[in-house]
Structure formats: structure tokens, C-alpha cells
């Protein structure tokens, strides 16, 4: 379920999906649930996000995200979100090429989260997730009747927000950082006898610096590093080079048909990867982003994501902007590829988000 790792909101989207150390808002439940502890006592935010996905390839794939975050007591915070990923209209055919009907496969997840300040600067958070994937809509594939895939998972995270300190000319600075271990959960299965697939367990760590120039101008510079915690697929002797009749023989790496915890451990083992330590290093994805605020009302954002060419080659720049006025906030993000010689299905991706201060509405 790659959908579980797609950044849903336009604020982080405008910063190349940097989010683990970004200042807390309603979208914290996705990037770092621990940030919910710092949304503020008596504060309640609601958010909606919409992303047309892979528009260069298909016209009707889209990701929708609804969320809410609230401060609880002096040091707590809670959040909830619903994510819905529509794969558009697909015509199914049998092995003879005959149409079996037109359907709209989809995936969704429902999250709840709680966070607590452990000190004035540190917080911890945990979220629980129910995820559903209905890809084949009960069709017979490879002689097997498919079913809806379901799983449950959890995220565990921490967040650090330092004291502001004085700099020259009246400027102020603040260090921030965080760590999120997400999608720790059972494998997902689409048929009774078929193989179970890993969900995208992910480790995301990040740090940043908030620089307040004066009462009107503030700049944040942040970076995230991501690594999938699932075992790397081994290289198999598919061509039967040794003529022993076994085309499933592993000739480099280790068997990836292991349990969830064993898979997390194996994801760090260089000997389990066909290209050893070099491949382990290639599995880290780096995101860098910056955000400028004027008078806490208008924001401009930019970012860059780098992924190794052998691990997806998702390299792109992003830009975005945001507006806050009274109880409403609006954000927009746009993605364009870093390599203009290689066309990417993600190019020209846009994201829209709206944020509402629910406390102000209820007054």
C-alpha cells in the first residue's frame, strides 16, 4: 500500500515532503504525531487536502485527506484523519480478454493519535491505523478469488522544540527535530492462499532551524531523511544460468519472505542486499525544504527531494505558497522534475489544502 507513504497536504508538499520537524499543525498526525502535543491548549484545527495523482498518465486517480487536531489539557494533543485514495475507473478483463465490468478500486485508512509533552521541549506520540485496500473488487486473478486487503498498524514518534535564543540585530533562532517510525503492522493479503505483502514501514528523521528576522519575517530551513524498513528483494536465478532447473534460487541477497519484525531488522543488513552496503546507502531518501512567512499571514515554500535512480528515481523540485486570514488557511503546492531529460509520471503534480480554526467557528 504505497498510499500510506504519500504526503497528503500542500504545506509539506511545497517543501518536497519535509514534515517531521515542521511547526505543528493539523497535518501533524501524518508526519509526526508527537507534534500534536504542541498545537496548544484549547486549540482545535480541521483540515482538508486534495491531490490529483499521476495526472500525466491517468485522468481520475486522486488522494483525499481529512484531519482534525486538538490540544488536550496542559500537555496533551489528539488527532484523527481519514485518507482515501481512488485509483480511478478500471475495466477488468479475464484471461481471454473479455470485459468483466468496470470498477473503481480504492484504498483508505483511518487514523487516531495521541501525544504528550514529556518536558517543555520534548514530546512523544503514538497513532493507530486501520487500512483497507480493495484493488481487484472480487475478480479472479491467476485462478484465485481476490478479496479486500485489510491491516492494522501503528506509528511511534518523538518531537523536539528548543527554546528561542537571541541572535544579532534582535533576531531569534530555534532548533527543532523529530523522529517517526510509521506503518508498523501486519502484512496485507489479497486472497486466501496468495502471498502476503509488506506494508511500507518507514523511518523518517528530520531536523530544522527556525529563524525569526523581525516581527514580520520568519524563515524555516528543514531536512528529512527517509528509509523503508522492509527487506530488499534478492536477485534470483531467473534464467537458470547454472542449469539446475531451479529458477527461484537466490544468487545475491537473502530471502525476503520473512515476518514483519524480521523484515525490519533485515532491512538494515548489508549482507541481505544484492549490492551489499552500497545498496543500503542507496535506500536513504533525502528531502530538503524551506518556508518563509510574512506576518504569519503569507508563506512561500520550496524544496528538493533526492532518491537513488535504482530505488525509484523520484527526484524533483517543489514550490508552494500559503495564506492565513482569520480562521481560514489555504495552501498550494506544485511539483516539477529535477531531470528534464527523463520524464516523470509525478511531474506537474499539484496539491491543495485548507485549514480551519474550529475554535473560532464555534465561538
Over which residues does each language-model region extend?
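Subset of outer-membrane beta-barrel
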Residues: 1-363
